[in-house]
Amino acid sequence: MRITCWNVNSLKARLGHVLDYCRSGQTDCLLLQELKLADEAFPHDEFAAIGWNSACHGQKTYNGVAILSPHDINDVTKGLPCLTEDDKADDQSRYIEATVAGFRVGSIYLPNGNPCPGPKFDYKLAWMRRLHSRAQALFAEEIPAVLGGDYNVMPQEIDCYDPSAWAGDALWHMDSRAAFFLSLIH
């Protein structure tokens, strides 16, 4: 199964390119981030016209994630499970998960977290704790799973041109990096 992740930074602006990529046959499942459109504006019909299925968790102007595939998309879940009462107030469309061709796939648009420190950084770390919890639950199910997308983290020096230029940025912050590795490795 070939799975591709793409932060489209506005599906409306990139729809032609996304449709062309789907038609190219280079992937079996396409995970999109930063759709910048509400669920009701998602172009399901355009994808269906080329034989692709789609599921989205959209949000007007900001965020938004989707799963596209020529295979059936089943058991769709929108949003991460809540761990605390505060999590219930999370109205940002940053996570969608479904079963595609025997794989459990999640499309992730992790919060940026800037400015750091501050409420946006706190939200990022809380969101990453929820992601870690969900990843652990998926691993416990012992089914093939892929959580792909835009993690908004630079885990290693090789992931940026000049680490010193990112000092103080949430993408390079040690807490972000530690949470990233915790989510994926443990």
Question: In which residue ranges do the predicted regions lie?
Answer:
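Active-site-proximal beta-strand elements of phosphoester/diester hydrolases
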Residues: 1-10, 102-117, 148
